[in-house]
């Protein structure tokens, strides 16, 4: 009850104050307050997923309307090719998928999880459809074309999100894309990270050859 009546709305208010929800419009420009951060999309997605979990337990028209408003913002500002990232679209559009350390795939994964949870809780599939378009774009850029500047995420998350997307939709290629991301780890050159060694992101060896826990533990989990 505390989560439903207090926590979810306190976080909502804080995200409004800090500009996280406004950032979904992808219209920030230099000189404006509340410059988006590279992982803000994941913050918003986690809130949306939490709201979905609450809605699954008990309907709440006010909470559902708040999520729907955010979904509409995403729909209005998603790129035609399916890409959606508030930081890169507004701040560095030319740098899309060029820096492994900047959490694009991590943010995408949290958005996928939120979309699955919301569809499961409410039966509404608009958000899910938007994120399936994004997943399809990621599959094309990373697996089919291999045109991104990196091939595996700097921060794991999208792998488990793609499994959830597969379980909900039955679309096996999402499972195969998850497998592809996992099995590509440790198979590419050192020095692809600007700030961290490959061990930091569990990319120093193929997954099945790793015998010790290394790097940033949240990524490893």
Task: Name each model-derived stretch.
Residues 1-221:
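Glycan-recognition and catalytic cores of secretory/periplasmic carbohydrate-active enzymes
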